[in-house]
Amino acid sequence: MTKSEQLFERAVKHLPGGVNSPVRAFLSVGGSPRFIESADGAYIYDVDGNKYIDYINSWGPMILGHNHEVIRTAVIEAAQKGLSYGAATEAEVEMAELLCEIVPCFEMVRMVNSGTEAVMSAIRAARGYTKRNKIIKFEGCYHGHSDGLLVKAGSGVMVAGIPDSMGVPSNCVKDTLQAKYNNLDSVIELFKQNKDEIAAIIVEPVAANMGVVLPEEGFLEGLRELCTKHGALLIFDEVITGFRLSLSGAQGYYNIIPDLATFGKIIGGGMPVGCYGGRREIMEMVAPVGPVYQAGTLSGNPVAMAAGMAQLKYLKEHPEVYTKINELGEYFRNKVNELFDKYNIKYQVSGVGSLACIFFADSRVTDYETAKLADTKEFARYFRFMLEHGIYIAPAQFEAMFFSNAHTYQDIEDTLLVIEQYLKIQ
């Protein structure tokens, strides 16, 4: 029995499923999860001494690679002053100024501790501002685990084989309306059926929790126009795309400005953090200046702020990072497609910039229904093969691969070699 297996055996006795987040349990791919001991650059190391090229990157935030010196130094310096004060700090002011400078839709911002918290709070602010209750979300888009949004969600909910979650009362989701991603007609119909009742549309501008499904031409523009026409707010969930597609996120990349946006993961440089923000008149609805209550004891934690600022400042000062990681992503996707052609395989590779996903599906994936056609059993076999050969990808068909500044073309070539070995035995 490996040390990882021993740890998992201990973990299941005291942690539900042996993990603190369901997808880590490897239920959809089989086998025991690897317990990670350390990480550096593009690589992670498990407790049994195995080295992997890492394409999870802590689910996105390690855009510079693991254990980056600039971030590590900032964390150490901040921690030496104190871990948490429960009071206002200069660091959170500087972070807010930096975010409002970089993010196109931000005039004001509120720090929180996770992406889920950011989304919950943004929706509450939207409802308070518009004095409406109904929200439109898209099938297959994942916005965290808050009650009102666990309806046909993506991410781990899709691979768990459950459409929603027990413990969520029907009243919690009665104001959550479902539209089809990349289908403006479904959105138009909801506005017709719920005239003057819709507070906001929330969307992953790139549906990265559904397998990196890209917006069709005109889709995001159409959402912007519909929200403006009907007096609803447009919320971009940029927990995955933020500061990854570009320094200004998906809203900068696609030049579509939402009214509110949510971020997580990456703005903490690897520390637990999130934020939501947008137009001043909306954000001034938030307490203590407005009637929309939202609070957090550890929000704006000084160590997290230091880590986040270090990463964002580095990205701002080094635009070549985006050139490199986007080229790596494009190179990988092109080479995988060449392998599919070589072996006459009809699988799909999707992605944009430094995001990628290999779909074990015969036809192009554009929405929730086509994503569900993917062969998850085939993905499980592929995942185990990759893991056994030193490539660490997300243990779920519908998650993204993340390329970092620490990855090299040699890492990509080594990964492509393993993929080709897998295709040869099919």
From Swiss-Prot:
GO BP, sorted A to Z: protoporphyrinogen IX biosynthetic process
This enzyme's EC code(s): 5.4.3.8
Residues found modified as N6-(pyridoxal phosphate)lysine: K265
Presence of the UniProt keyword Manganese in the record: no
Top-level taxon of the source organism: Bacteria
Subcellular location: Cytoplasm
Pathway in which the depicted protein is active: Porphyrin-containing compound metabolism; protoporphyrin-IX biosynthesis; 5-aminolevulinate from L-glutamyl-tRNA(Glu): step 2/2
Reaction(s) the record says it catalyses: (S)-4-amino-5-oxopentanoate = 5-aminolevulinate
Reported cofactor(s): pyridoxal 5'-phosphate
GO CC annotation terms, alphabetical: cytoplasm
CDD domains in alphabetical order: OAT_like
Alphabetical list of InterPro entries matching this protein: 4pyrrol_synth_GluAld_NH2Trfase, Aminotrans_3, Aminotrans_3_PPA_site, PyrdxlP-dep_Trfase, PyrdxlP-dep_Trfase_major, PyrdxlP-dep_Trfase_small
Keywords: Cytoplasm, Isomerase, Porphyrin biosynthesis, Pyridoxal phosphate
Molecular function terms from GO: glutamate-1-semialdehyde 2,1-aminomutase activity; pyridoxal phosphate binding; transaminase activity
Predominant localisation class: cytoplasm
Record note on quaternary structure: Homodimer.
Entry's family note: Belongs to the class-III pyridoxal-phosphate-dependent aminotransferase family. HemL subfamily.
NCBIfam families linked: hemL, PRK00062.1
HAMAP family: HemL_aminotrans_3
Protein name: Glutamate-1-semialdehyde 2,1-aminomutase 2
Organism: Lachnoclostridium phytofermentans (strain ATCC 700394 / DSM 18823 / ISDg) (Clostridium phytofermentans)
